[in-house]
């Protein structure tokens, strides 16, 4: 790879091949214990061929290599930060890159404040002196802040208030069909979710079309596959039909004629997530599954991801999601379905293990023949759909709203946003 010359880090040092090499090597270091340190474990070595040339040597053919480089995990950090950050916690609260804004302050519970980078490589950018993000969980509060001018942009515009926001002449609403999958994992290490009939019953018990209306006000669509249709090699397999009678029959066949008790967690506690959790809880109750529901705070999710012994994992039913930021089928599924990616490695909260699925993941990732790769991903998705480690819920839309004077603040299909050229136009 040939690097752009003259690019400076936020600390004033030059981005060169040695900096790129260090960023990837330390990012993948087992000592640092970053959550996604395995993101580039297919790289054999990285070399600085000259000051502005970086050479990657891979362990084997890897068809999604360029897509992986597009992920934020591959962002190049300042050597000075990497050398002093001895833990992943240090990296979580500090930032030093080459982007248009520099980090001033970050407190996850309060705010994220950045200021203009005067050395940004694009002349005339960025336009703002500073940007401030504030976490606001409650939907109506978030909308009110935008309407009163306290905020100029809101991510996750409240779906139930979109008609009101659209009617406000001072605002703009943006809705993007996303690559975000919402699903409910079932811990397959624990009874009764080790029984495929129980997992199938859970899928039949939930009316996905009604869920889209009740929790998302129509700004979602029932999941009709393992990954959204925008992802290459996605296969339409459903959605699972709503059939509570079939669900009760399957529970009876599995040995649970009167249902059972369990726990239902939501990984998020915003208004839409809580509505989703409550709706699913009610649907399950109608077929005899009595679930004690709880929406987790951000810190409580460590209970799931920090657990190192799969046999002691506390989650049973767990509503979460996955956003495929690389728009590649491998990263769209592997983190949550590959057997080696169980917490705390990555996001296989179902503790799903299927050797045939693992083999297909590896074959498809290495196969350079597009037709063979498509066939392998098709078979893989069909197996996952049949095994049903999840209740496949919805593909949600990404919604945002902004003051009409705020331009070039763009919402992306993976739920993130791009604001490099954002400006205020009167």
Describe these PLM feature segments.
Residues 1, 20-24, 54-56, 99-102, ...:
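Short, well-ordered beta-strand elements
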Residues 1-33, 49, 55-57, 145, ...:
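Aromatic- and charge-enriched surface segment that lines or borders ligand/interaction sites
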Residues 2, 37-82, 105:
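Surface-exposed binding/hinge segments that line
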Residues 3-4, 118-164, 290:
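Ligand-site clamp/hinge motif
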Residues 29, 72-98, 103-105, 120-127, ...:
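Short, solvent-exposed loop/beta-turn-alpha elements that line the ligand-binding surface or hinge
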Residues 63-69, 97, 213, 253-272, ...:
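Bilobed periplasmic-binding protein-like "clamshell/Venus-flytrap" ligand-binding domains
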Residues 108, 139, 155, 252-324, ...:
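Ligand/substrate-recognition segments at binding pockets and active sites
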